């Protein structure tokens, strides 16, 4: 499927969410598909993702991010580092607007064309719980600390922690979205940090290993 068949894509998203035991409202489903449509439109010019087929985008981007959202329950200030096209941050924000209404999601990337896309998504989808920042995370003076810092396909764990550790609040944690369990990366975590949990994820219709890595001070 290369054409943007909205009913078919919606059906796959709804079925996948059911497989994740997630209940999405009609408004959330509409916004997720609207986000996908924007990604398809902008991708042809801005090269946001190597995935070109909207059907594959539902599984590899939307459902892959939705599989992780429950791990963020209770978080108030979340930072998505190297946000790129908005994964998992935009998906998390769409979910949180109803599921975790006090959550705020900040997206940071160094590439202006990517943050321009994210700013457009925020505006078109009316995501009041999202802020977008163009900066290098290691040099960024954020207006506040974050209780959760996340990333997907951003960097090795030691770099992720070293570059953004100054932005993590006391008692906060990193949640990294990874493919195969990164045992070597875990072994090379810098001093002062420890892995609290490595959690396998099952993403409907995705035949690939996915893991969440929870890192805290210790």
Swiss-Prot record:
Listed GO MF terms: rRNA (guanine-N7-)-methyltransferase activity
Localization of this protein: Cytoplasm
EC number(s) from the headed UniProt entry: 2.1.1.170
Binding site for S-adenosyl-L-methionine: 82, 87, 137-138, 152
Enzyme class: transferase
Entry-linked InterPro entries: rRNA_ssu_MeTfrase_G (IPR003682), SAM-dependent_MTases_sf (IPR029063)
Entry-linked Pfam families: GidB
GO (cellular component) term, any one: cytosol
Keywords per UniProt: Cytoplasm, Methyltransferase, rRNA processing, S-adenosyl-L-methionine, Transferase
Recorded catalytic activity of this chain's protein: guanosine(527) in 16S rRNA + S-adenosyl-L-methionine = N(7)-methylguanosine(527) in 16S rRNA + S-adenosyl-L-homocysteine
Family stated for the protein in its record: Belongs to the methyltransferase superfamily. RNA methyltransferase RsmG family.
NCBIfam families linked: rsmG_gidB
Protein name in the entry: Ribosomal RNA small subunit methyltransferase G
Lineage: Bacteria, Pseudomonadati, Pseudomonadota, Betaproteobacteria, Burkholderiales
Gene name per UniProt: rsmG
């Amino acid at each position: 499927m290369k054409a943007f068949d909205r009913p078919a894509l919606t059906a796959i998203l709804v079925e996948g969410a059911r497989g994740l035991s997630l209940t999405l409202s009609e408004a959330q489903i509409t916004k997720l598909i609207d986000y996908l449509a924007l990604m398809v439109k902008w991708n042809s010019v801005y090269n946001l993702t190597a995935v070109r087929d909207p059907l594959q985008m539902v599984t590899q981007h939307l459902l892959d991010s939705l599989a992780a959202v429950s791990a963020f329950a209770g978080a108030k200030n979340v930072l998505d580092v190297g946000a790129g096209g908005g994964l998992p941050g935009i998906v998390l924000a769409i979910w949180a607007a109803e599921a975790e209404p006090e959550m705020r999601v900040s997206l940071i990337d160094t590439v202006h064309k990517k943050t321009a896309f994210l700013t457009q998504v925020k505006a078109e989808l009316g995501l009041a719980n999202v802020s977008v920042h163009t900066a290098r995370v290691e040099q960024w003076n954020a207006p506040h600390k974050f209780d959760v810092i996340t990333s997907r396909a951003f960097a090795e764990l030691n770099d992720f922690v070293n570059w953004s550790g100054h932005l993590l609040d006391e008692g906060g944690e990193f949640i990294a979205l990874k493919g195969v369990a990164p045992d070597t990366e875990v072994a090379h975590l810098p001093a002062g940090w420890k892995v609290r949990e490595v959690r396998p994820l099952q993403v409907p219709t995705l035949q690939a290993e996915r893991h969440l890595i929870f890192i805290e001070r210790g």
